[in-house]
A protein has these predicted regions:
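Solvent-exposed, non-transmembrane alpha-helical starts
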Residues: 17-18, 57-64, 100-109, 139-142, ...
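Hydrophobic regular secondary-structure detector
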Residues: 1-113, 268-623, 627, 631, ...
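Extracytoplasmic
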Residues: 42-48, 56, 77-79, 87-92, ...
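Short beta-strand elements
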Residues: 37-38, 71-93, 115-135, 165-182, ...
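Helix/segment boundary signal
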Residues: 2-11, 19-36, 51, 108-149, ...
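Flexible hinge/switch segments at interdomain interfaces of large molecular machines
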Residues: 36-46, 83-89, 124-148, 177-183, ...
Length: 798
């Protein structure tokens, strides 16, 4: 077969060249259409389930939500393992499936399980939600909004009404996590004095409000048509005020007679700032296998359409907070520049040694042809065009030209020998024989080189997912160069050297040949000695290898840093933001820092599930050299070290994402302690934490989960409840209503889902344990009873 291919290429060169040209054009066209990404999809097959549980502590969430869900989901087919996290108000369960499983089938199996799970959860828990299928890098772009004229409630409403829906409608966007601002709720704030006057229970008020929002349905049949019965279930605020209530005495009155009805802010679970100014931060999450560069362009186009609306509302858009696409394009440009430079160097060396421009060009032409074909073949395996693929092609740069050089050099040598003959043979016949002479060695050499990279394809887990595309790209580049050497090189040689009559060796070869012959003769005179020297050199390399510093990835210079800070557990959002604003102000003064943003807490449906003590910063840099980036890194680190009361991590985005994929955390080394007693786990973790802090080999040591978060514990006394004519359910409903409010219903206003919340509190109160103790509820006889008279209230740690 090889003989026929080479013969066709030499005797019908135009057919071969035309065919190669068509393939090259197709590959180029296909390459421009392919998706661009940073890394290959390196995360395992994950399904993440989040369950919001308003008002529940971390321990209550763990016992009443997380553990029941874990038991319910434990027997799903193809699941490798399950991990969970419980924080105040939120349960997160991450299911990891086998690598050979299918994403869609995995999600379908989990969804089927979730359909019947609501009955086993407490009433405080919302329906468990399966998070969108996101890419490994997750974040496509981070943007922010600030305003000097709008308050944070109006700013958040604007973002939720106009920005988030526009972004979510874009192809490739999986989710938008919104941090900061205040969401709206319709609050029904009860007046305790008027409650006593009209003598109506909370249960009765809730029932009346729910009934007013019932959907009326049905239809009637007339002789010639069917008429649907409808009633607008979305009641405007004016009509809510007019809802009729009926107490046990048969007295009718309006809701506005006992309550103030108005729009207020939902209790915050996150805050955000841009350059130390309060605002809204949006983290845009990409879908699995998303084209980061293309989606970034779509986002920019979408935002440009909204800029007039944004400006008219006196809002400032910050769209340069974090853009991974910049790093992708910069990396691709850098690698392509190096490929071009490498190709030029190869061409120069070939011209010097071959002393024949045509021969050098034929050999060098195999580089772009081989890399183009290898790129398309690699993409056909299902991977995207990413840094690892291009790195594989770059490594193969020096190899892909070898086959062509061997072929062309042997052709020229045989043609020179033929030219010296009295009766020279046909040049095409000489070219054909010369190509066949080296064909076996070229094929065997290519196969051996390809086999060296096969182990990369056999790696499993994160390492396999990360480096397999590099190995595939390299192997296919060598294979493509072999194809080029069998077809294009003989075809071009037959056209270029058809009338070749040169008999002299190239000048450089003539110059160095005598010296090389002397060295070779000397070495071959002492074969044992030089074999021992070679063996010693190899052995020393093996001995020194363990002493080298090893790392999974190099320190990437992305032009962007991620800062994670953690204060004492229980620190409020306001205090966390105060500390963060101080850090932001100092970091902005560092030369080379372009912008900085911060968010604290968590977003609904967000991947990061942390409490109010946790904060994350995005630091975007100007275009700097690697050395200057390191200087900025060190200065930021110095700012963080000198900030009291926090522990911190300072990473680049990609390294952090790889660490988070491998361990579930943003650190390269994670130690988890298991046990049956939270107290004992806390003691052991604190001892280990102190020991690790003393090590000189470690830095940024953090204790993520601690037990001593302060909380208010309310223990109801059944005897006192009975004595005061109050049921336990009534007391618990009162607590929910008085502290965070009781969500009665939801309704849509435009695209916003507005919760209707019943509140029983003094709007001007100062939240403290004394306020909790002195909360007044009314028993069935209308008598006022303080909460401290029916329960034990104390501050505990949990």
């Amino acid at each position: 077969m090889f003989y026929s291919i080479i013969r066709l290429s030499i005797y019908k060169p135009l057919i071969t060249i035309s065919f190669v040209l068509l393939i090259s054009l197709f590959c180029s066209w296909k390459l421009f259409q392919t998706s661009l990404d940073i890394f290959p999809e390196f995360s395992p097959k994950l399904v993440v389930i989040q369950t919001e549980s308003q008002g529940l502590s971390a321990e209550q969430v763990e016992n009443n939500v997380t553990r029941p869900l874990e038991s319910y989901l434990a027997a799903i087919p193809n699941m490798d393992y399950l991990r969970s996290e419980s924080i105040a108000g939120l349960s997160v369960i991450t299911l990891t499936f086998k690598e050979n499983s299918d994403h869609n089938i995995n999600r379908q199996l989990v969804l089927e399980k979730l359909n019947g799970v609501k009955n086993i959860l407490p009433s405080n828990a919302n329906t468990p939600l399966m998070m969108p299928l996101a890419s490994s890098a997750a974040t496509i772009m981070t943007i922010g909004f600030t305003s000097e004229e709008k308050n944070l409630l109006d700013l958040r409403t604007f973002v939720d009404q106009h920005i988030s829906p526009a972004l979510l409608s874009l192809n490739g966007v999986a989710d938008v996590n919104v941090f900061g601002g205040y969401e709206r709720q319709l609050s029904i704030i009860l007046d305790k004095d008027k409650l006593l006057k009209y003598f109506i229970s909370l249960e009765s008020i809730i029932d009346h409000i729910k009934a007013s929002n019932l959907i009326v349905s049905g239809s009637i049949q007339t002789p010639n048509q069917e008429l649907q019965i409808v009633s607008n279930n979305v009641i405007p605020i004016e009509k809510i005020r007019e809802i009729n209530l009926l107490n046990d005495n048969g007295q009718y009155f309006k809701l506005k007679d006992i309550a103030t009805i108005k729009f207020t802010a939902v209790k915050q679970i996150s805050k955000a700032s841009i350059e130390a100014t309060d605002g809204i931060v949006l983290m845009i999450i990409g879908q699995l296998n998303a084209d980061t560069v293309a989606i970034t362009k779509s986002i920019d186009q979408s935002l440009s359409k909204l800029k007039a609306l944004i400006r008219s509302n006196k809002i400032e858009l910050h769209d340069q907070i974090f853009r991974p696409a910049n790093y992708i394009l910069k990396s691709l440009e850098s690698i392509l520049d190096h490929l071009v430079l490498g190709g030029c160097l190869v061409l120069i060396v070939l011209i010097i040694f071959m002393f024949n421009l045509k021969a050098a060009l034929i050999s060098a032409l195999s580089i772009p042809i081989s890399l183009l074909l290898a790129s398309i073949l690699t993409l056909s395996t299902g991977t995207s065009l990413n840094i690892m693929v291009i790195a594989g092609l770059a490594i193969a740069l020096g190899e892909v030209v070898d086959d062509a050089i061997i072929d062309v050099e042997n052709i020229l040598r045989r043609l020179r020998e033929n030219a010296k003959l009295k009766n020279p043979l046909n040049t095409l016949r000489v070219i054909y024989k010369a190509s066949l002479e080296v064909r076996g060695s070229v094929i065997y050499a290519s196969l051996i080189v390809m086999l060296v990279f096969v182990p990369l394809l056999l790696l499993s887990g994160l390492v396999g997912r990360m480096f397999a595309p590099l190995g595939i790209a390299y192997i296919l580049a060598i294979f493509s160069s072999l194809i080029s050497a069998l077809t294009l090189t003989p075809a071009l040689s037959s056209i270029s050297f058809r009338k070749y009559t040169e008999t002299k060796e190239p000048f450089v070869i003539n110059l160095i040949s005598p010296l090389y012959k002397k060295i070779l003769s000397y070495i071959t005179s002492f074969p044992k000695l030089y074999s021992i020297i070679a063996l010693l050199l190899c052995s020393s390399g093996i001995i020194l290898a363990p002493k080298l510093n090893f790392g999974f990835l190099p320190d990437l210079r992305e032009g962007h840093f991620m800062i994670h800070t953690s204060s004492i557990t229980g620190t409020s959002l306001s205090e966390t933001m105060r500390i963060g604003d101080n850090i932001s102000s100092k970091v902005l003064q560092i030369e080379g820092v372009k912008t900085i943003s911060q968010w604290a807490g968590r977003a609904e449906r967000g991947a990061d599930t942390f409490g109010s003590h946790y904060s994350e910063f995005e630091v975007e840099l100007y275009d700097l050299t690697g050395e200057k980036e390191q200087i900025v890194h060190d200065k930021i680190r110095e700012v963080l070290i000198n900030t009291p009361g926090i522990s911190f991590e300072l990473n680049s985005f990609l390294v952090e994402r790889v660490d988070e994929t491998s361990s579930g955390f943003t650190s390269p080394i994670v130690i988890q302690i298991f046990g049956n007693s939270l107290v004992n786990i806390d003691i052991a973790s604190n001892k280990l934490h102190q020991g690790l802090l003393e090590s000189n080999l470690l830095r940024d040591v953090q204790l993520k989960s601690v037990l001593d978060k302060p909380q208010i514990n309310i223990e109801f006394n059944n005897k006192l409840l009975a004595k005061n004519n109050i049921s336990l359910n009534q007391a618990k409903l009162f607590i929910n209503t008085a502290i965070d409010g009781f969500i009665i219903d939801n309704y849509y206003e435009d695209v916003l889902l507005i919760p209707v919340v019943l509140l029983y509190k003094d709007e001007n109160h100062i939240e403290s344990i004394d306020y909790i103790k002195n909360l007044v509820l009314f028993n069935k006889l209308g008598q006022p009873i303080k909460l401290k008279d029916i329960s034990e209230i104390s501050i505990t740690k949990g």
